[in-house]
Amino acid sequence: MAPKKDGKATGAPQGFTPERFEKELKELATRAQEDTFTKRFMGQGFVYFQTLLLLGLLGVASSASQLNLSPIFGSIPSAVTHTTALKAACFIGWAGNLMLRMVLPMSTSQLLPVIALNIPAIQFLLGTFTDRLGSWWGPLIIEGFTLFPLAIVSAASVADVLEDADLSALPKFVADAAPGIVSWGLFRLAENQSMEKLQGVIGSTFVFTRVGIEVVLGAIYAIMAPSKYLVLAIPALLHTAVLNTHVMTPMATDALNSTLTAQNWTLLERRESLTGYVSVIESLERGYRVMRCDHSLLGGQWVQLNGRRVSEPIYGVFVMLEAVRLIEREAPLPDSEANALVIGLGIGTTPSAFVSHGIDTTVVEIDPVVYEFAQKYFDLRENKPAAVADAVSYTADLVKQSKTYDYIVHDVFTGGAEPVDLFTLEFLQGLGDLLKDDGVIAINYAGDFGLPTPQLVYRTIKKVFPSCRIFRESPRDEANVEKWGSDFTNMVIFCRKTPGEVTFRNPKQKDFLRSQVRQALLLPKYEIKEQVFLEDEVTDVLSKNETSKVTKWHQDSAAGHWKIMRSVLPGTIWEQW
């Protein structure tokens, strides 16, 4: 007989022991804590992601605004009021976010794409009034209707988002101040970085053109906050697509040419590049063409004269630079044995002449589009391809290679002011190292003689090159000085590396290259005595670490240059791009 089973339970099932139950409770509690932490972490991460995205987009929009103003005003006038007004706009948006939330029929995030998508059309329409607005009020008013509303609403949106930021771990005074201060710093970082990056890719595709960047920004804002209010941007989008000649498309270019042809001008080609908006335009009535970069001219030449085809420079300063060949030496130097370094190409007037004379000529030009257009539209002559590079680093490499030259031509200019880095003592000393002992340098300087800058630049040049003579492109015109409020002109400074008199031999017929313009302008005429620049006891020079000495006067110089450019070409040429 089988034994009887014991009716007493030997113990509770393993899954229901008190120890097991307690363990499960602890696990549930831990999981609940983890879920709360994960949610909080994800929530805070999203807050800061939105903040960074809004600030980054505003930084890019700020850079795009400046890029769109530079063809109409130049980069320097465009920037005069830019940062100050942006500070005011961001402060208004940051401080007034609650008011905007109450009065707007939509959220600030929904308003952002409406503003952004309207910007290209507003810039175009207001740009047609720049002759009347001038170079100071013009940028301020245009950005006042475009970038600054975007900045106000962006700052308000950031303030709204950061209301959900958990700053309880910080002291109260830090938590109160940090969001605004850090947001402004991040915006400025985004603005500076975006401008630097955009200049490297500008013009490479439609997305990276001036108007293209703004259209893409508007699309991103719309994706972030889609709403029924986007219909308010449809008229502006249609204008940008059909009527805005600033858009870099074949249709817009054809429309622009139709407008220009009615005024006896034609656009041969245009491109956006790292130094600015570059184009070649031709006067059908007067028979000359010029290369434009933003709101300045890099040079020009006659192509039709009295019904016959010609190729003559129209600006005397570039012909004057060729006179560096005429400076007398102890031992005459045949052109076939000479070599030259030309810094800054423009349309290539001076290097083409050197090559025509048989001089071995090296050209360094930073902008590949300028080089391409000089080849394509201005009969650029070469005996070797130009070096497309930054002049500072390129000449430093030449010094390391112990290269030397008989002639150096320094011919650089940017939108109403000298490029400071190329007039510093350190850069000029590098050119001195590249110049042979009996070599000669010609430096083209464009600036306002009513400002201290020309004196400072000349003292710096004299620190390196002991013997110099200075010539204006044209005599001082008191009527123009009164009209424009400045004495802005080109001057060419001819210098020797070693002490000795700077004298010019009389040009021969072959020096003129069968050019009537060279016959009239090759030999410099309007000399300025160096005492004009050295009459006071000031001895300071322009060093690499002290460029602020010059930049503080750039605004006045650029304003004078803007007025002159508006008298050289009609305002509609500048405004239409």
Predicted stretch roles:
Residues P18-L58, S62-A85, L167-A177, A190-W302, ...:
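Soluble small-group transferase modules, centered on the S-adenosyl donor enzyme superfamily
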Residues N264-K462, P466, S474-V481:
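Soluble catalytic regions of membrane-associated enzymes that act on cell-envelope
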Residues W94, I152-S157, V211-A219:
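Transmembrane alpha-helices and membrane-interface helical segments
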Residues M1-K5, W574-W577:
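A positional/structural detector of protein chain ends, strongest at the extreme C-terminus
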